């Protein structure tokens, strides 16, 4: 084997090792994204909710800053209930469809139905309440006590 081939093989192996260290996204995150966009008729993408208030996004603490943030807290609590039932809400794939009235669940197993219901209720809640740009990317250490 030529030295250039060895270098190329080494580069491929190193990049594969690096890629294997990247944690995967939760499997149902894409589904939740579609449910959000279905519920609000495309007015806002799911990215608007990734870092909103004290509870939208990873983790959560303190008092929700508004009704929209309360939707995220309720969604977190719903996922906690799913885990108590032995479900894995961030990994559970489910069947749903987007109708004129918004998203609907169409899943067979109890865990799929429960997790889908959590996500549909959150998506509908997001669509129901106004979005306040001032609550996006807030300083959670100061405002979420």
From Swiss-Prot:
Localization: Secreted
Propeptide residue interval(s): 22-27
CDD domains (alphabetical): PLA2c
PROSITE patterns membership: PA2_ASP, PA2_HIS
SMART domains for the chain: PA2c (SM00085)
The keyword Nucleotide-binding is assigned to this record: no
GO biological process, one term: lipid catabolic process
Cofactor(s) this protein requires: Ca(2+)
Keyword Ion transport: no
Cofactor note: Binds 1 Ca(2+) ion.
Protein's recorded name: Basic phospholipase A2 PC17
Organism: Laticauda laticaudata
Source species taxonomy: Eukaryota, Metazoa, Chordata, Craniata, Vertebrata
